[in-house]
Amino acid sequence: MHALLRRVTRGNGFYIGDLFHAAAGHDATTPVTLDQPLQYAPELGTRFTVGQLAEQTDELAARLWAAGVRPTERVALYKKDNFDIALHACAAARIGAVPALLSPALEAPVVRTLLDRLDGPWLLTDATTLAGPLGTVLAPASVRAVLLTTGTPAEGALPAAGATGPAREGDAPPPAPVVRLADHRGAPKRPPVFLHPRQPSLITHSSGTTGVPKLAVHCPEAGWHRLVPQKVVSWPIRGKEKAALCMTFVHSRFYQGLAMFLSHGNPMLIAVDPDPSRIGPLFARERPGYIETHPNTYVDWEALADAPGEPLAGVRVFGATFDAMHPRTIQRMLGASRRTRPLFVQFYGQSEIGPMAGRWYTRRSAARMNGRCVGLPLPGFISLRVVDDAGKRLRGGRTGHLEVRSRTRILTYLGEDQRYAEQLHDGWWRVGDMGRRDRWGLLHLLDREVDRIGDLESSLAVEDLLMSRLEELREVVLVPGADGEPVPVVATVDESPLDAARWQRATSDLPTMAPVRQFRFEDLPRTSTRKIQKPELARLIQGVRATDQGVGA
């Protein structure tokens, strides 16, 4: 079936360089509102049309071409968090370059490692970022040139273009030149370049929950196959509801979400800052009918359910595509909407594959939901099986490794082809999660393979229960202790001490665990999508075990 559909749909591609132009071709007046001005052009304000954003994409593409960027060349983007990350990525893709999106949350040494894997890319950043830790880790030959979106090179950071002088025999490689893109303002407009559908067109990185992130190489064809089922699901609200996206601009999901609603002609609201104190008034003013953010951000947005102005009252559909959501959070989101029949649509996926399974919830079904059930594999796009350690398919109801076959898979891990190949078994991709299928074919996600703790069937299920039983929890995760025992780590909504008696009652019927550890929420190690880095947290727990002050068993 997959081979047949691949032949039928061959030649289709998803090109982020054409996002705003394609939307403008349908209706150039469709509004797009930002929560913050563009960093490189704050004078333009926060209200645009898709036609104006297409013009901005053309302007930035012309600047990149004038600076020397050419088709198939890699452009690493690592800068202050702002929607202009997306615009510069679209601009690079517009001229056929390959944007490599690096999260602003990554530490400079990790960025240096990823730049080395990118093998001498152009580096697009801003002067403030360059003058910070990034400038101290850049090796002379680690990048082809530095392209500044704003500001000028800080004195002593890196020399300006042409300031290095003639090379002499035996000299070390000269530092990379620094180019201000603003110096190429008004450069001639360039025609679009569309790479082959199976050619690398975008590079993103994995969450990095287990260490240095992997660089995922995407192609237009796989992106197109990811987008099709999402456009089908969003069809009922096409052109009607204002769609609000608040997620990292360095994940492929953002561009899929953008394309999904731009192609439908929906007005859009794009936010950088997820803080409830700021996103609440924004939603109360703009009244989105669709919102999507990271699962952990939704937990913070539970505070919006009772916020002044009822910021979630107009939401018809809540969307989530990164990880399984806590039932408590879904219930509170749906309860905060004043629409007649609001829905929470949840997809389970990963960077390497995109959405793999999905389902939706109403207020009634959410009240009795099982947080580990992530729905049915997407028919026609995803084939999913559960296998044992030897790769043998397991019957329904048995727990094993999840593997998928699809047309949505990335091409490789850049610089780690062998690591990529090790996850393929006769065309089946080892997802890295443990789960099972029930009698109806529904997928139940139990744990990441690397996060399994002893004989505990599912640490995620325990976390769901604790979040539902203790409304004061903002975060709870289970990690292995020094002796392999489950250690619960929590953070509370207001950083108040966890009540030992309430914890005891909430855990009385759960598997035996070590004493609970309470952290400040901001001290928990996280990824760019706000997921907890469990291996790092486990190392932290084990390293400070001797000074632990537990709350209770």
Curated annotation (Swiss-Prot):
Q: Which organism is it from?
A: Streptomyces cremeus
Q: What is this protein called?
A: 3-amino-2-hydroxy-4-methoxybenzoate diazotase
Give the classification, highest ranks. Bacteria, Bacillati, Actinomycetota, Actinomycetes, Kitasatosporales
Which gene holds the coding sequence for this protein?
Answer: creM
Which intervals of the chain are annotated as region Disordered? Answer: 157-178
Summarizing the function annotation, the protein's role is: Part of a gene cluster involved in the biosynthesis of cremeomycin, a light-sensitive o-diazoquinone with antibacterial and antiproliferative effects. Catalyzes the last step of cremeomycin biosynthesis, the diazotization of 3-amino-2-hydroxy-4-methoxybenzoate (3,2,4-AHMBA) with nitrite to generate cremeomycin.
GO terms of biological process kind: antibiotic biosynthetic process
EC number(s) recorded for this UniProt protein: 6.7.1.1
Q: Which PROSITE patterns match?
A: AMP_BINDING
From the UniProt record, list the reaction(s) this protein catalyses: 3-amino-2-hydroxy-4-methoxybenzoate + nitrite + ATP = cremeomycin + AMP + diphosphate + H2O
Give the signal peptide as a residue range, or say none if absent.
none
Q: Where is the composition biased (Low complexity)?
A: 157-167
Its annotated pathway reads:
Antibiotic biosynthesis
